[in-house]
């Protein structure tokens, strides 16, 4: 009998080999994974009927058996009609098939995907195996530069370390307001699933504890299926398709885990008009930070990946940082190295904060200076962050001005932070080992672009200020 790991490896290889074949026909990896998702759900529904005698969740005439009976152009027509019907349902199925469209219009290749799925028994496969196969495909898609999917993918080792630090508990609610393919929610679920709890709490974890939001229909489909394959949200998806920033949070949550999108809002997005926000700004990351600050219950805690400019930007950035220190306990900042994200040149940090008490001191862990990771030769692994997690839990300062000035873990009293220009949190103390800048051209260009955007926003704010002075 094949082991779970061998089943996982062989099936992943099989699925990805077909992806490579379809790519040669102009069918991108993202389109392939989306169609795979649509078809896999149909197949698992059919297995549920056949093996367990359950009633099909798919309307008669549009089930798996109906689809595989067709060939040629009739197959394409039947598939497209099925997608249209299912996208209009108001349940988990409707979420998975949100704005579903067929992207494999050549019958021979559509049949290949259907045949591959039909050859396997998916429902009886261990949930962890199904989920691992699907996640590995999502990760491979994130690595594909042409797909652009890397923007939705946070490195799993970083997610795991963040969850280990936040320590979510059974009975708590966990939200990711920019959930991508669901990595944070799934990791939090796995973490809590291992805790002993009553049946009531286990049911709560499966059906009500998790909540994700994303404004891209395709990503909502992938996230919903990712969680469904792990047994989460079997009746209604915990993922909703909307723009988190457009309205005030309807409910408060215990835990927030997120890596909101960097950069400006996409073209065509609704302008942010939030009376509950502390300050008006067009900076996407600052708006997400405000939104998450307002989402937390008293006693709630958050771990959020944010770019460097959030730490030092003037104007709105300074206002938000002051509110964060005043109304929240911003207790820890993890400074991340470049080279760990699929989008090149990203300089980011993880901010850990809780609601209820003002900040008294901030602990910094510098995992950036003299740290070099690349996706090809020195990929970030969970063990690379072991020392940080240990420091986070133990709170014993490693830095010592005389004996260990290169120590990566040190604390600053909040008064010292407030006294800094613009209440800047952009702090480094470790002297680099060399003077050579070994960043790639892409990383250098990204850094220049980031600084240019910051300067541009500062000029805009200054122009507004001068205009107000002239009017008065």
Swiss-Prot record:
S-adenosyl-L-methionine binds at residues 151-156, 181-183, 214, 243-244. InterPro entries: D12N6_MeTrfase_N (IPR022749), DNA_Adenine_Mtase (IPR051537), DNA_methylase_A-5 (IPR003356), DNA_methylase_N6_adenine_CS (IPR002052), SAM-dependent_MTases_sf (IPR029063), T1MK-like_N_sf (IPR038333). It is an enzyme of class 2 (transferase). The keyword DNA-binding applies. It catalyses: a 2'-deoxyadenosine in DNA + S-adenosyl-L-methionine = an N(6)-methyl-2'-deoxyadenosine in DNA + S-adenosyl-L-homocysteine + H(+). GO terms for biological process: DNA restriction-modification system; methylation. Keywords: DNA-binding, Methyltransferase, Restriction system, S-adenosyl-L-methionine, Transferase. Its EC number is 2.1.1.72. Gene3D superfamilies: 1.20.1260.30, Vaccinia Virus protein VP39. One of its GO terms (molecular function) is site-specific DNA-methyltransferase (adenine-specific) activity. Belongs to the N(4)/N(6)-methyltransferase family. The subtype gamma methyltransferase (M) subunit of a type I restriction enzyme. The M and S subunits together form a methyltransferase (MTase) that methylates two adenine residues of an undetermined sequence. In the presence of the R subunit the complex can also act as an endonuclease, binding to the same target sequence but cutting the DNA some distance from this site. Whether the DNA is cut or modified depends on the methylation state of the target sequence. When the target site is unmodified, the DNA is cut. The type I restriction/modification system is composed of three polypeptides R, M and S; the restriction enzyme has stoichiometry R(2)M(2)S(1) while the methyltransferase is M(2)S(1). Type I restriction and modification enzymes are complex, multifunctional systems which require ATP, S-adenosyl methionine and Mg(2+) as cofactors and, in addition to their endonucleolytic and methylase activities, are potent DNA-dependent ATPases. PANTHER family: SLR6095 PROTEIN (PTHR42933), TYPE I RESTRICTION ENZYME ECOKI METHYLASE SUBUNIT (PTHR42933:SF4). This is Type I restriction enzyme BthVORF4518P methylase subunit. It comes from Bacteroides thetaiotaomicron (strain ATCC 29148 / DSM 2079 / JCM 5827 / CCUG 10774 / NCTC 10582 / VPI-5482 / E50). The lineage of its organism: Bacteria, Pseudomonadati, Bacteroidota, Bacteroidia, Bacteroidales.
């Amino acid at each position: 009998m094949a082991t779970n790991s061998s089943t996982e490896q062989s099936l992943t290889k099989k699925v990805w080999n077909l992806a490579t074949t379809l790519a040669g026909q102009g069918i991108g990896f993202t389109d392939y994974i989306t169609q795979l998702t649509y078809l896999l759900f149909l197949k698992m529904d059919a297995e549920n009927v056949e093996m367990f005698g359950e009633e099909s969740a798919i309307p008669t005439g549009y089930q798996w058996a109906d689809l595989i009976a067709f060939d040629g152009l009739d197959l394409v027509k039947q598939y497209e009609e099925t997608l249209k019907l299912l996208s209009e349902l108001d349940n988990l199925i409707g979420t998975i098939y949100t704005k579903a469209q067929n992207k494999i219009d050549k019958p021979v290749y559509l049949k290949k995907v259907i045949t591959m799925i039909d050859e396997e028994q998916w429902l009886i496969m261990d949930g962890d195996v199904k989920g691992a196969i699907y996640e590995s495909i999502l990760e491979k898609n994130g690595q594909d530069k042409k797909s652009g999917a890397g923007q939705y993918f946070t490195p799993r080792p970083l997610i795991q370390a963040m969850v280990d630090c936040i320590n979510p508990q059974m009975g708590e609610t966990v939200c990711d307001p920019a959930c991508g393919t669901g990595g944070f929610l799934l990791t939090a679920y796995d973490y809590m699933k291992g805790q002993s709890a009553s049946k009531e709490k286990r049911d709560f974890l499966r059906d009500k504890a998790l909540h994700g939001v994303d404004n891209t229909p395709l990503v909502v489909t992938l996230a919903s299926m990712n969680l469904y394959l792990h047994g989460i949200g079997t009746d209604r998806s915990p993922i909703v398709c909307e723009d988190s920033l457009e309205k005030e949070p309807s409910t408060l949550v215990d835990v927030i885990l997120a890596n909101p999108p960097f950069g400006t809002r996409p073209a065509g997005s609704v302008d942010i008009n939030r009376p509950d926000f502390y300050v008006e700004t067009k900076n996407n990351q600052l708006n997400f930070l405000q939104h998450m600050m307002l989402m937390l219950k008293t006693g709630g805690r958050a771990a959020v990946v944010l770019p460097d400019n959030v730490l030092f930007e003037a104007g709105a950035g300074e206002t938000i940082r002051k509110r964060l220190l005043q109304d929240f306990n911003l207790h820890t900042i993890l400074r991340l190295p470049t080279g760990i994200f699929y989008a090149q040149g990203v300089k980011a940090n993880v901010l850990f904060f809780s609601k209820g008490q003002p900040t008294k001191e901030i602990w910094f862990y510098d995992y950036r200076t003299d740290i070099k990771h690349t996706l090809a030769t020195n990929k970030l692994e969970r063990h690379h962050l072991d020392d940080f997690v240990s420091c986070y839990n133990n709170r014993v300062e490693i830095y010592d001005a005389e004996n260990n000035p290169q120590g990566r873990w040190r604390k600053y009293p909040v008064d010292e932070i407030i006294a800094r220009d613009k209440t800047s949190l952009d702090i480094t103390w470790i002297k680099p080992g060399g003077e050579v800048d070994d960043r790639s051209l892409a990383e250098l260009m990204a850094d220049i672009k980031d600084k240019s955007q910051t300067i541009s926003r500062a000029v805009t704010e200054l122009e507004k200020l001068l205009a107000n002075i002239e009017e008065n």
